[in-house]
């Protein structure tokens, strides 16, 4: 599997590079970084003390010409440029970027008519199994329970609520036969009035180096149920991304997510 990594100098990018280098079936063939990055020209394995022969570059076409797959955990504007390059070079994509606009999501979906794409806000096995647990719980706590989603991430995260929190909201809303767009409440301030019993609330915390904590609260009278997932390391995301690459190796064009990769549909 000839794999390139986008955002190669970032925290997630470095974790992905290490995972690829440690996988006997994978070959690191490219490492992309943003234009103007001080890391351009450095070896992709320098942070590990390894010489990979792969230099960080901002030349999209040079990297895509060598790759079969690109793993992309960057930002929406960068990912959209990577999608265009992937279409030019027939490269399959594993995308963990969050914060897309509706228009960008539509463009991503259109690209999947030509190339294979796994797109998931969270690629850990634990989170995706948690989504199934939430669907089950929501069906049994559909009456008399208020639903709130609380998430916490590091101080550098730029979007809120997190993509994973929104995935959890979609899972719960879908199990209840609702549209998340119609029932989501994002933060509260001032005199809000009584809670709408059909709403799903979101609260976001930002601070320190929190990798990612998510709790879905089902609050009833006399009891409350909390389903929580906590990430202590990004390694679970990297391993999930490689699992997604293996999944794509046996697939043609199409848009998939980690529920497909893990056989949870």
Curated annotation (Swiss-Prot):
One of its GO terms (molecular function) is NAD binding. Signal peptide: none annotated. (S)-2,3,4,5-tetrahydrodipicolinate binds at residues 154, 163-164. NADP(+) binds at residue 34. GO terms for biological process: diaminopimelate biosynthetic process; lysine biosynthetic process via diaminopimelate. NAD(+) binds at residues 7-12, 33, 96-98, 120-123. Pathway: Amino-acid biosynthesis; L-lysine biosynthesis via DAP pathway; (S)-tetrahydrodipicolinate from L-aspartate: step 4/4. Its EC number is 1.17.1.8. It catalyses: (S)-2,3,4,5-tetrahydrodipicolinate + NAD(+) + H2O = (2S,4S)-4-hydroxy-2,3,4,5-tetrahydrodipicolinate + NADH + H(+); (S)-2,3,4,5-tetrahydrodipicolinate + NADP(+) + H2O = (2S,4S)-4-hydroxy-2,3,4,5-tetrahydrodipicolinate + NADPH + H(+). It is found in: Cytoplasm. One of its GO terms (cellular component) is cytosol. Keywords: Amino-acid biosynthesis, Cytoplasm, Diaminopimelate biosynthesis, Lysine biosynthesis, NAD, NADP, Oxidoreductase. It is an enzyme of class 1 (oxidoreductase). The active site is at 153 (proton donor/acceptor), 157 (proton donor). NCBIfam families: dapB (TIGR00036). Belongs to the DapB family. Catalyzes the conversion of 4-hydroxy-tetrahydrodipicolinate (HTPA) to tetrahydrodipicolinate. This is 4-hydroxy-tetrahydrodipicolinate reductase. It comes from Burkholderia cenocepacia (strain HI2424). The gene is dapB.
